[in-house]
């Protein structure tokens, strides 16, 4: 059975939780390192989602201009 794809908002919320836990300074160095690694992975996933969305918007905008010009 496949794993359900996590939403952008859920990933962003997890990242914010990680940042908050690291900012308050109440976690160990080892936990900070694990959190940092998880945060970097989440950042990369979030960046990919944003780049994909940007690409889709660009395609839609280009198509809109072509449709307008051919009218």
UniProtKB/Swiss-Prot annotation:
<dbReference type="GO" id="GO:0006308">
    <property type="term" value="P:DNA catabolic process"/>
</dbReference>
<comment type="function">
    <text>Bidirectionally degrades single-stranded DNA into large acid-insoluble oligonucleotides, which are then degraded further into small acid-soluble oligonucleotides.</text>
</comment>
<comment type="subunit">
    <text>Heterooligomer composed of large and small subunits.</text>
</comment>
<dbReference type="GO" id="GO:0005829">
    <property type="term" value="C:cytosol"/>
</dbReference>
<dbReference type="GO" id="GO:0008855">
    <property type="term" value="F:exodeoxyribonuclease VII activity"/>
</dbReference>
<protein>
    <recommendedName>
        <fullName>Exodeoxyribonuclease 7 small subunit</fullName>
        <ecNumber>3.1.11.6</ecNumber>
    </recommendedName>
</protein>
<dbReference type="InterPro" id="IPR003761">
    <property type="entry name" value="Exonuc_VII_S"/>
</dbReference>
<dbReference type="InterPro" id="IPR037004">
    <property type="entry name" value="Exonuc_VII_ssu_sf"/>
</dbReference>
<keyword id="KW-0269">Exonuclease</keyword>
<dbReference type="GO" id="GO:0009318">
    <property type="term" value="C:exodeoxyribonuclease VII complex"/>
</dbReference>
<keyword id="KW-0963">Cytoplasm</keyword>
<comment type="similarity">
    <text>Belongs to the XseB family.</text>
</comment>
<dbReference type="Pfam" id="PF02609">
    <property type="entry name" value="Exonuc_VII_S"/>
</dbReference>
<keyword id="KW-0540">Nuclease</keyword>
<keyword id="KW-0378">Hydrolase</keyword>
